[in-house]
Swiss-Prot record:
Organism domain of life: Bacteria
InterPro entries hit by this protein: YcgL-like_sf, YcgL_dom
Taxonomic lineage from the root: Bacteria, Pseudomonadati, Pseudomonadota, Gammaproteobacteria, Oceanospirillales
Protein name from the UniProt record: YcgL domain-containing protein HCH_02617
All copies of domain YcgL, residue ranges: 6-90
PANTHER family: PROTEIN YCGL
Coiled coil: none
Length: 106
């Protein structure tokens, strides 16, 4: 059974921007699976938080976080999904040299 509140620690990934792992503060990151650590990199402590089911979180549901910590020992918050098409447009623009009016007239 998931407790009504839990003191958790939040760690940022050293490999992937906007990826975080939430763990019970008492447990820490020592019990995280090796496969997760390979993907995640060295955990960088962000802060500790007293979490309740009703606590609003930016990109996660508090009850889901608490349940995952209870069941698996951690909750992994993945980076937000970006629109692949727009990222392709931005990358293409960055790789295309600027063309001026004079270049077009030649």
């Amino acid at each position: 059974m998931t407790p009504d509140r839990r003191l958790i620690s939040i760690f940022r990934s050293s490999k992937k921007e906007e990826m975080y792992v939430y763990v019970d503060k008492k447990q820490g990151v020592g019990a995280l699976p090796e496969a997760l650590l390979q993907l995640f990199g060295k955990p960088q402590h962000v802060f500790d938080l007293l979490l309740t089911k009703e606590k609003p979180l930016a990109r996660a549901d508090a009850a889901e976080v608490m349940s995952a910590i209870d069941e698996k020992g951690f909750y992994l918050q993945m980076p937000p999904v970006q629109d692949d098409y727009m990222m392709d447009v931005v990358r293409a623009r960055e790789q295309t040299p600027a063309v001026g009016r004079k270049d077009l007239d030649d």
